[in-house]
Amino acid sequence: ADPGPLQDFCLADLNSPLFINGYPCRNPALAISDDF
């Protein structure tokens, strides 16, 4: 069974020096309302 959709988002970390098949996700604890 799939877990709840609460964790089904990824904010791209555009400032990360890594680029692995796309941008890595930012720490969700650092998300603010302006990110959405």
Curated annotation (Swiss-Prot):
One of its GO terms (molecular function) is cysteine-type peptidase activity. Optimum temperature is 25-37 degrees Celsius. Keywords: Hydrolase, Protease, Thiol protease. GO terms for biological process: proteolysis. Its EC number is 3.4.22.-. InterPro entries: RmlC-like_jellyroll (IPR014710). Glycosylated. Optimum pH is 5-6. Belongs to the germin family. Homohexamer, possibly consisting of a trimer of dimers. Cysteine protease able to degrade azocasein and benzoyl-arginine-beta-naphtylamide (BANA) in vitro. This is Peruvianin-1.
